């Protein structure tokens, strides 16, 4: 199960922190721009939710999707960039 997976939990925490660092360093504006991470050994990725400000991001708000871009865990919609990120991970 994704919610109980310690690797997914750690990626959620790491990515939430990285997004806050992007904003703090002036590398993104409003809600545009995001990073993602592929879950090692699984056809899953973790990505920022759509429309959520960087200051409001938490590990719990990060979204887990499969490599087709379909949300498999998380309460919010994934980023509008999810399809691009999923495409890259499918072809790496």
PLM segments and residue spans:
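An anion-binding catalytic pocket shared by soluble metabolic enzymes
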Residues: 2, 9-92
């Amino acid at each position: 199960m994704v919610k109980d997976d310690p690797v997914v939990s750690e990626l959620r925490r790491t990515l939430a922190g990285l997004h806050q660092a992007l904003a703090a360093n002036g590398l993104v504006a409003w809600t545009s721009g995001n990073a993602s991470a592929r879950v090692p050994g699984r056809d899953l990725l973790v990505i920022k939710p759509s429309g959520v400000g960087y200051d409001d991001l938490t590990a719990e708000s990060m979204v887990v999707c499969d490599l087709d871009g379909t949300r498999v865990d998380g309460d919010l919609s994934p980023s509008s960039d999810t399809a691009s990120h999923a495409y890259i991970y499918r072809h790496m």
